[in-house]
A protein has these predicted regions:
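Residue-level detector of short, conserved catalytic/binding motifs and their immediate flanks
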Residues: 47, 123, 186
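Extracellular repetitive beta-rich solenoid segments
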Residues: 2-71, 110-111, 118-120, 135-136, ...
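Contiguous beta-strand segments of beta-sheet-rich domains
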Residues: 187-193
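Short, solvent-exposed aromatic-acidic interface loops
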Residues: 158-167, 194-196
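Short, surface-exposed tryptophan/glycine-enriched loops
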Residues: 165-187
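Contiguous, function-dense segments enriched for cysteine-driven chemistry
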Residues: 157-159, 177-178
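Terminal (often C-terminal
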Residues: 66-138, 146-150, 159-162, 200-222
């Protein structure tokens, strides 16, 4: 460029030299994203993204958009027949570990039959089992109890089976489930109880197959 008089001193371009909105999308390199270094791991909660909020460009932490999908799916089972017991199921319990069976995410923990959740959230809690009634014992009941204070428990789901009038042992399925809002893992817990079991009644158990199993699936945040 030609000048009349003295050539001006060179100066670096600064942000104040450019009006807002003057640089269009067409002026940006096509590899402005793909040409940069890949993160290679899940972002930290404080990592930021640019989003268009009703046409206004804003930044957002990853913590607001992460998640989705099931993060906990755990199975436990009764490893031996439970005979003529009315009360909390507290023994012969194991997390499933054979063949194609498995669990997802952090595991439940159990102590004296009381199950503790690995994290807060809404959980689908269920019992699905096989029970046997002797001809002299007409009923079997399995109850899910829950607490919100790690102390007092109340019935929250129940499954019953009756073989009244049967001349011989009857095998039947028992199934019940509920959704538990785990707002505090120290206080919100569940247990499973048997009730109305006669002297010849029992829940079936095995270390190799899920005859009587307990299921915990985290559905989402509380």
């Amino acid at each position: 460029m030609s000048y009349i008089g003295k050539i001006p001193t060179a100066a670096a371009l600064t942000s104040s030299d450019i009006s807002d909105g003057i640089i269009t999308n067409a002026k940006l390199a096509q590899d402005i994203i793909s040409g940069d270094t890949a993160l290679g791991a899940e972002p930290a909660d404080t990592d930021e993204f640019l989003v268009s909020d009703a046409g206004v460009l804003k930044r957002m932490d990853y913590s607001y958009i992460k998640g989705g999908g099931i993060t906990v799916a755990d199975q436990w089972r009764l490893t031996a027949n439970l005979t003529a017991t009315n009360g909390t199921i507290s023994s012969n319990l194991e997390q499933v570990d054979t063949n194609a069976l498995g669990s997802l995410g952090s595991a439940m923990t159990v102590s004296s039959g009381i199950f503790t959740f690995p994290s807060t959230g809404f959980y689908l809690v269920g019992f699905h089992g096989s029970g046997a009634n002797a001809s002299s014992a007409d009923n079997m009941t399995v109850i899910i109890q829950g607490t919100t204070n790690n102390s007092s428990y109340a019935n929250i789901a129940e499954a019953s089976e009756s073989s009244s009038g049967a001349a011989q042992e009857q095998i039947a399925g028992l199934s019940t489930q509920c959704i538990v809002d785990v707002t505090d893992t120290s206080n919100v817990k569940v247990l499973f109880q048997t009730s109305s079991f006669g002297s010849g009644s029992y829940l079936m158990g095995s270390t190799d197959i899920n005859y009587s199993a307990f299921h915990f699936i985290r559905l989402g945040d509380t």
